[in-house]
């Protein structure tokens, strides 16, 4: 993938690794039993960074020879932007996973590719959708593993973004 993208992902990975070290130190220096939350959160973000690295490598294969892109590329690109804007600490990813499944369903109902180039392009898009699903599943699984005490301690924050009530798809659990 491009040098700029690769450097950005490498810098992100470095920051996340440092955050993991600091979260571990915080947990080791605290009497609060749920301080492992920060370490778990940073580890989940580090795993997501690895997925992003693979995703960037896949998307790099969509060079100029793949143009014009099929309509699926526009749709998945817009969805990627929506995920980037909404996947914050307090989002459990359930709604995003449902929406990704809806996109996949529409893709399956579409006509078969008309050329080898379109087939290969759509295969890369399918691979990208798989990576995005894995990224979202990492977040969903992190949230599912939270203890009630962690939810109360770390997610009952007054600065928590709006968009859901406890027990809803966009809420805390």
Where are the regions a protein language model picked out?
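Short, low-complexity, intrinsically disordered N-terminal modules
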Residues: 160-164
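Non-transmembrane accessory domains of multi-pass membrane transporters/channels
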Residues: 1-38
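Polybasic, lysine-rich low-complexity intrinsically disordered segments
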Residues: 165-170
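Soluble C-terminal extramembrane regulatory/interaction domains of multi-pass membrane proteins
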Residues: 36-159, 173
């Amino acid at each position: 993938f491009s040098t700029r993208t690769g450097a950005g992902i490498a810098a992100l990975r470095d920051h996340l690794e440092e955050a993991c070290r600091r979260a571990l130190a915080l947990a080791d220096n605290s009497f609060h039993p749920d301080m492992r939350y920060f370490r778990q959160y940073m580890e989940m973000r580090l795993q997501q960074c690895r997925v992003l690295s693979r995703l960037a490598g896949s998307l790099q294969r969509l060079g100029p020879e793949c143009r014009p892109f099929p309509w699926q590329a526009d749709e998945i690109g817009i969805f990627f932007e929506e995920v980037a804007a909404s996947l914050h600490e307090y989002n459990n990813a359930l709604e995003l996973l449902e929406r990704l499944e809806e996109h996949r369903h529409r893709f399956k109902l579409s006509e078969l590719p008309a050329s080898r180039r379109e087939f290969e392009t759509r295969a890369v898009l399918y691979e990208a959708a798989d990576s995005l699903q894995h990224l979202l599943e990492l977040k969903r699984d992190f949230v599912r593993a939270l203890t009630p005490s962690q939810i109360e301690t770390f997610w009952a924050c007054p600065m928590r973004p709006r968009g859901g009530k406890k027990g809803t798809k966009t809420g805390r659990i």
